[in-house]
């Protein structure tokens, strides 16, 4: 079975001949008209549709969803959107959403995206629903988690690989620079994704440019004149792109762990890998304070020690209790996902010690969590969706540029170096049915935007702190600096300081004072 081989595995679940012919999705345009106004004409039926909420159980797509969505405190709905906004009379999709009703006097809806791309907002809000329902945000807002087009319970849904193929290591590996050997492999990837996801027109519709248009439809159908929004990680990019397209429709926008708007996609890749290397070094230094650290007591030699543990898996996976085995790619996904938060370091140390002793069960569990694998062996579709969304968002590199990026990443993050030669590879989206539709740069400074709030963590490995500074500047909004070493913090119940300031902003539109700082 075909497999996209990874030159460099970096992110867990987390990225020629065209397949058929379809019209390119229209680039989004800034809308005119009064705040909250629905467009006249062909799109009016989407903006004017009535949302029918119902029990959430039928919306579950994973074992975890089945458990969470059985809670009768939540209700769910689907909202119709055009696959192609330039052809509203053509095929349609449905965006699924989950609601936690406000328990007090309601301001409106708070739309939430947890990142990814490919993350399920429904699952995220269901997980945090009890926490938010008990706090000030849950008192004043209907909290709405939505699955962006292509994700989770929304339809059509990105589907490139089966659960069985992921179990055999034949699906997307989580590689930042997938090693696609030639044009034929690129065509095979695009063809199987199109076949499983509703065809080439659907596959070309999954970009962020369409998602922000869907968000405006959601705003209107939920009855909100203006949008209140919480976006984390990739969700900050969605928020900023929405603000650029619909500045007059923004009420409040809290953006946590920001994608840097000043960097090209390649520059961001390198900044991110530099951030992971710094996180690895912080972890190694912490681990080295213990005499039984599996990477040794000299942090300077931690990269060498890690490679000595991980590289043998390139040839011989470590045994695991379920018989799947732990591969090199699995270890890298477990490692990088555990570097997202310092709270995961003890489990990472346990897993590396176990691996050094010849077993891979602990790290396999971390890998499964990162890849969205449930205890029943079913995977969510976050990996497939991330791949498809990036293909419609990011510029496509030439083989020479792709190969050079792989070399640069090895230099930026040596702990990820497999030791194998970097070979020339083609861009994984080379044969996608349409070119990317997200403008570059994707935000330049919306006109008429109300105050926004960007939260940025000083030791964030995945979205470096400087990105938050830059996004706050471009949006003309406020910055909240958080001293810590993790990715994502707003309204997660981990910092009273952060949660209080974010809640004050969302509820009362009160931004923190200049230079405001909190501790994770």
Q: Which functions belong to the PLM regions below?
A:
Residues 339-358, 396-401:
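Short helix-capping/linker segments at secondary-structure and domain boundaries
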Residues 1-27, 79, 215:
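Secretory targeting and sorting signals
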Residues 316-333, 340-344, 376-384:
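Structural motif
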């Amino acid at each position: 079975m075909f497999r996209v081989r990874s030159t460099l595995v970096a992110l867990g679940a987390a990225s020629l001949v065209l397949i058929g012919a379809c019209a390119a999705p229209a680039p989004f345009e800034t809308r005119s008209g009064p705040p909250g106004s629905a467009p006249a004409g062909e799109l009016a039926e989407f903006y004017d549709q009535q949302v029918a909420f119902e029990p959430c159980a039928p919306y579950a797509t994973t074992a975890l969803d089945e458990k969470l969505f059985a809670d009768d405190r939540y209700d769910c709905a689907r909202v119709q959107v055009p696959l192609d906004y330039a052809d509203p009379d053509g095929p349609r999709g449905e965006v699924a959403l989950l609601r936690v009703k406000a328990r007090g006097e309601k301001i409106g809806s708070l739309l939430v995206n947890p990142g990814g791309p490919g993350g399920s907002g429904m699952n995220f809000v269901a997980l945090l629903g009890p926490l938010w329902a008990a706090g000030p945000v849950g008192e004043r807002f209907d909290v709405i988690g939505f699955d962006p087009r292509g994700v989770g319970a929304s339809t059509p849904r990105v589907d490139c690989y089966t659960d069985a193929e992921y179990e055999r290591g034949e699906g997307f590996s989580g590689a930042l620079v997938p090693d696609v050997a030639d044009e034929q492999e690129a065509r095979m990837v695009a063809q199987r994704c199109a076949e499983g996801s509703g065809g080439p027109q659907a596959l070309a519709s999954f970009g962020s440019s369409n998602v922000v248009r869907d968000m405006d439809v959601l705003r209107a159908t939920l009855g909100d004149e203006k949008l209140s929004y919480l976006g984390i990680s990739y969700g900050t990019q969605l928020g900023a792109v929405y603000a650029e397209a619909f500045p007059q429709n923004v009420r409040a926008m809290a953006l946590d762990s920001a994608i840097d708007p000043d960097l090209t996609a390649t520059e961001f890749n390198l900044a991110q890998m530099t951030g992971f290397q710094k996180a690895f070094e912080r972890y190694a230094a912490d681990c080295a304070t213990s005499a039984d650290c599996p990477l040794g007591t000299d942090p300077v030699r931690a990269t060498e020690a890690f490679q000595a543990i991980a590289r043998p898996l390139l040839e011989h996976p470590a045994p695991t209790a379920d018989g799947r085995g732990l591969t090199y790619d699995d270890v890298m996904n477990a490692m990088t996902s555990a570097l997202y938060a310092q709270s995961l370091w003890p489990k990472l140390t346990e897993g590396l010690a176990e691996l050094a002793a010849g077993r891979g069960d602990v790290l396999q569990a971390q890998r499964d969590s990162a890849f969205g694998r449930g205890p029943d062996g079913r995977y969510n579709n976050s990996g497939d969706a991330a791949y498809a969304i990036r293909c419609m968002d990011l510029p496509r590199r030439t083989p020479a540029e792709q190969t050079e990026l792989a070399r640069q990443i090895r230099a930026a993050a040596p702990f990820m170096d497999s030791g194998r030669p970097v070979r020339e590879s083609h861009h994984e989206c080379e044969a996608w049915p349409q070119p990317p539709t997200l403008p570059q740069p994707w935000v330049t400074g919306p006109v008429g935007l109300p105050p926004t709030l960007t939260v940025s963590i000083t030791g964030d490995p995945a979205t470096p702190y400087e990105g938050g500074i830059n996004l706050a500047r471009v949006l003309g909004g406020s910055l909240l600096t958080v001293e810590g070493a993790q990715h994502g913090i707003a309204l997660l119940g981990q910092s009273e300081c952060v949660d209080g300031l974010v809640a004050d902003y969302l509820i009362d539109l009160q931004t923190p004072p200049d230079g405001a700082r909190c501790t994770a």
